[in-house]
Amino acid sequence: MARGKKTQETGSSKRRSKVQEEEEHVEGSEEEVEEPEQKSSKRGSRKTTNSTSNKKKSVKKVESDDDDEDDLSELDVVVEDDNPVETSDNDEVATTPQQEKSSRSRKNRGDHESHDDNSDNEEQGDRGNRREHKPRPKVDPNTPIGKLATDQILQFLQERGEESFNPQLKHGARQLLNQLLGKYNGQRYGSKRGGPPRGSFGQRGGFNSRGRGMPPRMRQGDTRDTRDTRDTRLRFNTTQSNRRELNDQSDDLYND
């Protein structure tokens, strides 16, 4: 019998525990339902506070706009006071200090631009004068040669070469005239710089048998006597037995 009582007691305790768990579950669900309600109420309160703050801001904006309008009206009055007024004494327009400053700045700009234009025109005029070549007066062919200077004689020869289509006379007289007047540039035997891109093709130009040629002293050729070379060739190409005869023949040739 004792065993049966224990089983009944355990069954009743299990039932009680289940009932307690269900009650706790129901209470937890109620709490969960209450939490979103509280959140929604908080959101509503926030919205109401935001709406009230927006209303306050709008009221402030309206007030600030009114203040700005008042300020603008004051500014308009000031500007109207600063507008130019025609005076009856001098019949001139009275300007404000700001307008005077702006007019001065405009005048200064105009003067500066006009000065620049004048300077540009002067530079162009100088360039034009530099490019202009004043021709020398022609020499009268009827004047005696004793009364002509050297440059006049050379100029006359140059003119005669142009008229007679003689380029040698024309260019020769012109070169002599330029040399006499100090306008002659001597012949240049090559430049010292390299080719178009630096370092390519070695050292092109200068005194290295390329470009405009070698200097004149290096182009003189062999200065030795050709007769000596001819004698040496004959001597080395023959035998010793015939040397005396060849020497006699060469002496006879030189004596002749």
Curated annotation (Swiss-Prot):
Residues 14-39 form a coiled coil. It comes from Acanthamoeba polyphaga mimivirus (APMV). This is Uncharacterized protein R561. Residues 21-35, 64-92 have a biased composition (Acidic residues). Residues 108-129, 219-234 have a biased composition (Basic and acidic residues). Disulfide bonds: none annotated. Residues 192-205 have a biased composition (Gly residues). Keywords: Coiled coil. Residues 1-171, 185-256 are annotated as: Disordered.
